[in-house]
Amino acid sequence: MKIFLCLIVVVSLQGVLAYHIEREYAWKNIIYEGINPASYNIENSIPTAFAHDATSKKIFITVPRINPVPITLTEFDTTKHPEGSPSLSKFPGSDKIISVYQPVIDECRRLWIADVGQVEYKEDEKKFPKQNAAIIAYDLTKDNYPEIDRYEIPSIVAGNPLGFGGFAVDVTNPKGGCGKTFIYIANFNDNTLIVYDQEKKDSWKISHGTFKPEHESILTHNGAQHILKLGIFGITLGDLDAEGNRPAYYLGGSSTKLFRVNTKDLKKKDGQIEPTPLGDRGSHSEALALAYDPKTKVIFFTEYNSKRISCWNTQKSLNHDSIDAIYDGPDFIFGTDISVDSDSKLWFFSNGHPPIENLQLTYDKPHIRLISMDTEKSIHGTKCEVK
């Protein structure tokens, strides 16, 4: 797979709109560094999410623990692997985690994960005994990434942790030591939002009608259909204000609507929230993840059914006419994660494994993809550009 550096024009090739793609990785299957592929089932190594550290140029990828997945938190160096299908190495210091769905890097270069504390198949429970879900942070500024924070989420708050979706890290004092941090974790099974106050070592959950599925989503892949009914799944944070609060944008996995709530209300343990409905993105625009770019004021969405990445400028009203596509490709199958790094590079990920019963995959061509673009270039000439 060639890398298209500094692509100036938008080209159309075999139905794929390639807008300023700067980097692309594609895997037929996941190979772990130093581990014999015969010791695990490649069909069960299904990555779900990633994070890119712009300083070290490393990518961290999570692979939920399904029998017999050997490593749940992995990494590779993009300077050593600028393209292709790199093998994944074990993340240092990750021996005490069970299964992870997503990593997030904050402004202080801390890598956060939410360990669900259990495996999804009973045959693995003897090897990985069930424990409380936990929020864990690692310091990426130091060698071997030492663990610097660990908080076990009470079961009454976590609910069913196998329903953890996306989460956001809210550093309210990034220039003042990073000690005041809140974590917001979406639980799409329980239709709740979990809040963790790092400073007080406390957590609570919030429920609201907008966290529930709007409808049943029909996922179509190769003629097969699967019905999804997913509650709140993705969350991203806007710009920090003078009081240390931000707008939090969220969506349901089975919804085409977008909502906003101020983090000031999320931080109140016994408070009430009054979300603002921002609008409807249009039919077949259901997404699992979204990411805000402070530089362009644009939110990007991974639409899992349309196989595209869409955008919306937060300075505009939200409706079908204000949404545009920055990437659209038939090989971008089941987009599961998206983020903007500290260099304003947009990264988005598809794992090629839609949750369809008796899914038949062939491993003769890549189906797992990770793609990067510059945020400004990606929206040039689209409805998301504000001149």
UniProtKB/Swiss-Prot annotation:
Statement: the UniProt record of this protein carries the keyword Lipid metabolism: no
Disulfide-bonded cysteines: none
GO cellular component, one term: extracellular region
Localization terms from the record: Secreted
UniProt superkingdom: Eukaryota
Tissue occurrence: Female salivary gland (at protein level).
InterPro entries: 6-blade_b-propeller_TolB-like, Royal_jelly/protein_yellow
Keywords of this entry: Secreted, Signal
Signal peptide feature range: 1-18
Role played: Probably modulates blood feeding of sand flies on vertebrate species by binding and sequestering different mediators involved in the host response. Binds biogenic amines. Binds octopamine with high affinity. Binds serotonin and dopamine with medium affinity. Poorly binds histamine. Does not bind noradrenaline and adrenaline.
Similarity annotation: Belongs to the major royal jelly protein family.
Protein name (database record): Yellow-related salivary protein ASP2
Organism of derivation: Phlebotomus orientalis
